[in-house]
Amino acid sequence: MFASQLFDLSGKIAVITGASSGLGQGAATVLAAHGAQVVAIARREEKLNSWSASAQGETSILAADLSDRSALADIAAEASRPFGTPNILINAAGINTRQPADDVTDAQWDLTQNLNVAAPFFLAKALVPGMRAKGWGRIINYASLQSRRAFANGISYGVSKGAVEQMTRAMAEAWSCDGIT
């Protein structure tokens, strides 16, 4: 049996944040190549355009700032327009600020928590009703080793990724009864 048969995502609609580079772009590339319709979200539109031009499969891009909590419901609605209601959400967007705890500013703390914790939660919350209506959904939140191991120069990032781990467990408790894991 070929990998394409084992990993066939035809008929699935995926929203992937942080898709302009790194792990998010890798996930978007693989899911599109295996048949999912992919909505790639990131801040850098030029990088999204470059990725989309080379991606195999059906893709759409959405340039958006996920750190703006007030825009997240609108971003989720916009992500649902190209292909319909998503049933896969991969939260790969994130920021890793590295500075000693004494040097962390309010703005740096807020940016890290908004992008790494609030964005995944509020995007999921906005997309879950559609997943629930379909009776199936998958939400993948990227965490980090720093969620379990403290680093002197990574307090805001480590705290955010610890929160992502716990949030993911709570999401599973809340939504698995609806087929959303």
Features from the language model and the residues they span:
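Conserved glycine-rich Rossmann-like NAD(P)H-binding loop of the short-chain dehydrogenase/reductase
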Residues: H34-S50
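The beta1-alpha1 cofactor-binding region of Rossmann-like NAD(H)/NADP(H)-dependent oxidoreductases
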Residues: A63-D74, D106
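Alpha-helical segment proximal to the catalytic Tyr-Lys
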Residues: P129, E173-A174
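Residue(s) in the substrate-gating loop at a strand-loop-helix junction
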Residues: S144
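Conserved glycine-rich cofactor-binding loop
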Residues: I13, S20-G22
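Active-site helix of classical SDR
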Residues: A124, S160, T168
